[in-house]
A protein has these predicted regions:
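Structured alpha/beta or helical-core interaction and ligand-binding surfaces enriched in interleaved
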Residues: 1-136
């Protein structure tokens, strides 16, 4: 049995900006919404898996250590995605095979410490990280 990482970005993003943002990233996000990701998780699908790994058991997400390179590359990716025209959010979850998301949380990227957030992410929780520009 294995862990898998799932996720999506909202529809309507600028494709050229997106390609630049994810260049050299190990994570690839298809466009979709909460229902798309949850359906994929429930059916053990692959359309919304965000890695091409056989499994994601060795992921640093949820392992309580903020000094992992994987988390730093994920932080860099999120900061790059923030620059994509039309982006509103990214969805991400870490699920044990055949276990569905039993919880959902929404946060804004400007309100979190990204490394700490991902180091302490819970399994089977779908996180919606809002990336739009906040105006104070």
């Amino acid at each position: 049995m294995c862990y898998f990482l799932y996720g999506a970005v909202n529809n309507g993003i600028n494709d050229d900006d997106y390609k630049i943002a994810i260049k050299n990233s190990e994570y690839i996000f298809n466009c979709g919404d909460i229902n798309d990701v949850n359906d994929c998780v429930e059916n053990c699908g692959v359309e919304y898996r965000i890695t091409t790994n056989h499994c994601d058991c060795d992921t640093a997400i949820g392992q309580k250590h903020t000094n992992k390179e994987e988390l730093k590359s994920l932080e860099k990716l999120l900061l790059n995605l923030k620059k994509v025209r039309g982006i509103k959010y990214i969805l991400i979850s870490k699920n044990w095979v055949e276990e569905t998301n039993n919880k959902q949380e929404t946060v804004h990227i400007d309100d979190i410490d990204i490394l700490h957030f991902f180091a302490n992410a819970e399994d089977n929780c779908l996180y919606k990280i809002e990336l739009y520009k906040k105006y104070y």
